[in-house]
Amino acid sequence: RQIERTIEKLPNDKSMIGFIGGPWTLVSYAMGKNKKNGTDKLSKFEWNIINDKLIPLLKQNVSMQLEAGAEIVMIFDSAANQLNEIDFEKYMRIVFKEIVSNFEKKVGYYAKDGVNYSSIEMIKTELSVPLAGLGIDSNESLTDFFNPSRKGFIQGNFDEKIMIQPPEIMKENLDKFIEKISSVSIEERVGWVCGLGHGVLKTTPEENVKFFVKKIRESFV
């Protein structure tokens, strides 16, 4: 009902984006591992939770959000960087096959902090996954992901930590961000959804948020 109520209040030209937590991120938080640095090899117990418990529930949740009117649903997998490379690739195949492939171009994926985006793109291509798009965190060079042959949107990736800085510092960095994005042709950046590398931090000045939105619209619309 919350999605339906929100849509009722949105103008017709605004979209509703739903979200779910990534399976491993949910396990990581539930087991108190979310603050852990470094990579992990998943135990049989953890794989069983992901495959037998979480995947079916998350698939059902995505379906419910789309039926309620969400245009797309993002998978936020902020702890995926904890997985070692072998487990990460195995994990991504499960997420793509069991969740994303059931909802053609209706599910996007976001991970952060050193996650291997090249592996994500490789697996997406290998499995012909109909991914709606990919969120990129602010540690990456966003222009590396612009390609006219790319399928799906690219979302990101101004540094959310800069947003909490004094306005003059934030504005200076935003100008540099805009200059770099503007160096890429319009054809290459088709499908770019401008945003932050992660969410808005709670200490972000409202003035900075308003300026960011205004400046981006003036620069690219």
Where are these regions (language model features)?
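Active-site-proximal, glycine-rich beta->alpha crossover segments in alpha/beta enzymes
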Residues: 1-64
